[in-house]
Amino acid sequence: QYTPEACRIDLRPLARRAGARFIEARVSGLTSSPAEVHLSDGSALSYDLLSLDVGSEVDDRALQPLGPRLWPLKPLDVFHERWQTLLQSPPEAVPRRLAVVGGGAAGVEAVLAASAAWRQRGRTLSCVLVTGPRGVLPDHSPAVRAHVQAALSMHRIECLPHRAVGTPDGLLLDDGRHHPADLVLAAAGARAPSWLRDTPLALDARGFVAVNAHHQSTSHPNVFAVGDVCSRVDQTVARSGVHAVRAGPVLAHNLGAWLSGQPLHTYHPRRWSLYLLSTGSRQAVLSWGPFSAAGTWVWRLKDHIDRGFMARFGSPSVSPSPPSPPSAPPSAASGPHA
């Protein structure tokens, strides 16, 4: 429903406006003495004050035996390129049995978008969503789950409330059944970046950076972190994009305050977050605490909010493409909004 360009934010002009130097590279590690961030090209950056917002990885370790049949949704650019190549392949070369592992928002949107892409191209695709024992969207209200389940049922997408491990030709479910699959999309949970294990930073039990209410490292006061890469030690905060966005102004203040010796601010997560989940064909489901709704008007609301967010950062036009088959599961561009 959107072009890839409309879903990207170009960081270069943002960095120029802020007077910052932009470096495109992957982090491979960091040290505190000397205080350096190490990059995958072998170079290092010295720091006095460090802010981490590098996100998380898809936890697909149990699915690794699938080999080339396993496609994690992250990194999104890699996934998108593979998906586009797949859509352009001749009918005899495309999968007929798709499984998506993950019962959260990303898994739901991915399986519905994939189903729509095949359906609108006149192709047959058998889709299943493997959710784990808690089922679809376990942290949302029963009404939201019912809306999503109705959308899945309408498109004949089977839900399997089981844990699964990968095999060379499909998935082995925790009830002993084997589910064959030509392609498996991994959207199951977040895993901390592996390089964090070798740093001096205090981590939680799952390997994420432990931070206090100011989003400051509990072990290194000159290191801050927001988003999926960190875990609050004072309360449980869901790994949701909305918190990375809303913590931004607090982080900006705290970085300046730390440098000038001023008091730090606390990030107070809202009790409820607004989720707008695309279910295909310009339909969407709204979830806000105990409240829910579904329909075209929800998609229009989502579209309006997403366009506004992208426009704030000088993105190219985010007008929807002309009505055409979906080009990729939109999981990375959807989810929490406020």
Residue map of PLM features:
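FAD-site-proximal beta/loop scaffold in flavoenzymes
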Residues: 68-94, 171, 178-246, 253
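Rossmann-like NAD(P)H-binding beta-loop-alpha module
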Residues: 83-125
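Rossmann-like dinucleotide-binding cores of NAD(P)H-dependent redox enzymes
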Residues: 1-3, 112-162
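FAD-binding core/adjacent interface of flavoenzyme oxidoreductases
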Residues: 17-99, 185
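A conserved FAD-binding loop/helix module that cradles the flavin
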Residues: 229-279
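C-terminal auxiliary extensions adjacent to catalytic cores
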Residues: 281-338
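N-terminal Rossmann-like dinucleotide/flavin-binding domain of flavoprotein oxidoreductases
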Residues: 1-49, 140-158, 336-338
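FAD-binding beta-loop-beta segment adjacent to the flavin cofactor pocket
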Residues: 207-224, 267-268, 281-291, 298
